[in-house]
Amino acid sequence: MLIVIDASRLERKRKEAIKSRTVHNRHHYFEGVAQARFVLRKVFRLIEEQAKLGGLDPLEHQVLIQIYGSPQMKLRVKEVAEKLDIAPAFASNMLKSLEEKGFVLRLASERDQRVNYAVVTVQGKQLLHRIDEQVQVHVDYFTRQLTQDAREAAISIVMFYFGISLNAGKVTHA
């Protein structure tokens, strides 16, 4: 289902959020923040539920996503830790668990045998695809329930956080 959003309305809401953040009564700003956090939290919870149904801890699911979604489709333990903002030792333990489940392989670097990379196995990719398909069903249902105002409020706050502005149909960094 494709939902079309009026870019000029969205940009107006983003500007209103910025302005309302600078006044004494910031209710309008926090209204947008609340909506954005509600939408993001709900979507993340839906993703976590599907990961659990797929037999993964939600953080293990994130590990697989980060590895598979990286440009080279491989990451070192240190990089996994950075991407998830966790300790390298914890990242190493999660990779070991995923390796035992058959979802990750650890391979030595061709250039430096001391460096190991984690790669997602075919089985791991298939699991990610299945989880994603189920997530999409649930997210589509959830987002269809949102009003246009709620959707625009959430998007405008995310745009504000990322410093993005809509200008004559083109996205620019504010």
Task: Describe the role of every protein-language-model region.
Residues 1-54, 101-103:
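N-terminal leader segment of winged-helix/HTH proteins
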Residues 1-24, 148-174:
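C-terminal regulatory/oligomerization modules of transcriptional regulators
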Residues 11, 18-19, 96-155:
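Charged, amphipathic alpha-helical coiled-coil/dimerization segments
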Residues 35, 42, 62-66, 126:
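Pre-recognition alpha-helix immediately N-terminal to the DNA-recognition helix
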Residues 42-50, 83, 126, 130, ...:
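Solvent-exposed, charged/polar functional surfaces in cytosolic regulatory/catalytic domains
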Residues 45-87:
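N-terminal helix-turn-helix DNA-binding core of bacterial DNA-binding proteins
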Residues 77, 95-96:
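Short, hydrophobic-biased segments on the C-terminal half of alpha helices
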